[in-house]
């Protein structure tokens, strides 16, 4: 049996075990998604356009098909094989490319390339101007996260534990690194990050690795989340989200593990705190924001890890990784809601519905606009402005769809 098949079976077994635990006893309550209640908005949110990369028949799949922006264009991909370029201001589709591949990891974009990976191990490189395919290569493993693009190399993770460095000109492999994949892991991989002469990436074994961009030699590796526990479920320690780099510091978070700050040059851990996340974190000014596995949004001081605030109003709503605006943090949930929180206090500041389909990937912020794509490939763009009102006046935002039902997956 090949590595991919073994990994797929392991993931399926984990899901079956988790479902079995949830269903085996009527005495044990299943965590219910928090109900959305009316709020007093401090931001005005206006939907300005929508577009779709897939048709209405597309199945909602939790894949790593997020949005990317380069210049005045946003790029999106759908599992059925289409890739589109959209004008950010108007929502007009500028071109559509058809790969006929089961796309599963992307998009990544620069001024020179648009990259998307597939579940059958292909990586496509397109011309941003017209969507023409410049080259494609076949990797040995499924691609579940966007690639990273730099002038001299492309870095991409595959589900078999490998980090590949490819030439931007034709996709030929420059070097690769590999980490052992545990017998059981979450379905997902971390997006690599290129910082100077280092490629950084998290792995399913709870480690972050830094490799030299020139030859792939390992500069350091750090164990963020040591696997612990008796069962394989308890020992899950995946780092499935991108690390964040600020100056000489690296920030990362793992599942059933820790959020930590490391030194970029050496990998030394400066501080760490218990946390569990498979969606990830974002960094802004002097704070980082983490979407936890159980649906809390937590703000921490970047230098010390001290908690600034913790918002529990969105518990068990399957939050996406957060993004930041000037005064707000934005995340999305399993029912297609987009939530804005005040950056200073964590208070809910606004809410908008995109429909009833989950949003798995992080919102993308472009100036005062927020772009999201749901798991069926529908893209929504919102313009966000401060809400001015007389003292004592308030504007209520009421949920537009019914409260979630127990049988909905989180």
Where do the model's predicted regions map?
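Extracytoplasmic beta-rich repeat domains
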Residues: 28, 42-68, 95-110, 133-150, ...
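Structural signature of WD-repeat beta-propellers
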Residues: 78, 118, 158, 203-204, ...
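Bacterial Sec signal peptide processing site at the extreme N-terminus
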Residues: 20-40
């Amino acid at each position: 049996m090949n590595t991919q098949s073994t990994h797929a079976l392991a993931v399926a077994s984990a899901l079956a075990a988790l479902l079995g635990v949830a269903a085996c006893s009527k005495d044990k309550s299943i965590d219910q998604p928090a109900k959305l209640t009316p709020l007093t908005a401090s931001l005005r949110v206006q939907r300005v356009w929508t577009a779709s990369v897939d048709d209405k028949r597309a199945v909602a799949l939790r894949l790593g098909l997020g949005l990317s922006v380069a210049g005045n264009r946003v790029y999106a991909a759908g599992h059925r094989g289409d890739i589109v370029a959209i004008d950010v201001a108007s929502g007009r589709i500028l071109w559509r490319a058809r790969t006929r591949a089961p796309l599963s990891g992307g998009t990544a974009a620069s001024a020179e390339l648009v990259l998307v990976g597939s579940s059958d191990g292909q990586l496509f490189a397109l011309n941003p101007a017209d969507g023409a395919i410049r080259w494609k290569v076949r990797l040995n493993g499924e691609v579940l996260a966007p690639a990273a693009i730099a002038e001299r190399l492309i870095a991409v993770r595959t589900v078999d534990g490998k980090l590949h460095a490819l030439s931007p000109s034709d996709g030929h492999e420059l070097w690769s690194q590999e980490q052992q994949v545990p017998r059981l892991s979450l379905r997902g991989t971390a997006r690599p990050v290129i910082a100077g002469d280092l490629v950084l990436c998290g792995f399913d074994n709870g480690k972050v690795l830094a490799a030299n961009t020139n030859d792939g030699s390992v500069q350091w590796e750090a164990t963020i989340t040591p696997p612990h526990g008796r069962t394989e479920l308890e020992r899950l320690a995946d780092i499935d989200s991108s690390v964040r780099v600020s100056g000489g510091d690296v920030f990362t978070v793992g599942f059933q593990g820790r959020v930590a700050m490391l030194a970029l040059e050496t990998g030394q851990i400066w501080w760490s705190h218990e946390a569990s996340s498979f969606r990830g974190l974002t960094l802004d000014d002097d704070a980082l924001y983490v979407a936890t596995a159980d649906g809390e949004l937590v703000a921490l001081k970047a230098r010390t890890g001290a908690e600034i605030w913790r918002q529990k109003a969105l518990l068990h709503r399957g939050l996406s990784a957060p993004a930041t605006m000037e005064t707000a943090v934005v995340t999305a949930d399993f029912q297609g809601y987009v939530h804005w929180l005040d950056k200073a206090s964590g208070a809910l500041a606004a809410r908008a519905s995109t429909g009833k389909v989950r949003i798995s990937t992080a919102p993308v912020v472009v100036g005062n606009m927020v772009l999201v794509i749901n798991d069926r490939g529908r893209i929504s763009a919102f313009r966000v402005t401060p809400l001015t009102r007389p003292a004592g006046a308030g504007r209520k935002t009421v949920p537009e769809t019914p409260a979630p039902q127990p049988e909905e997956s989180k």
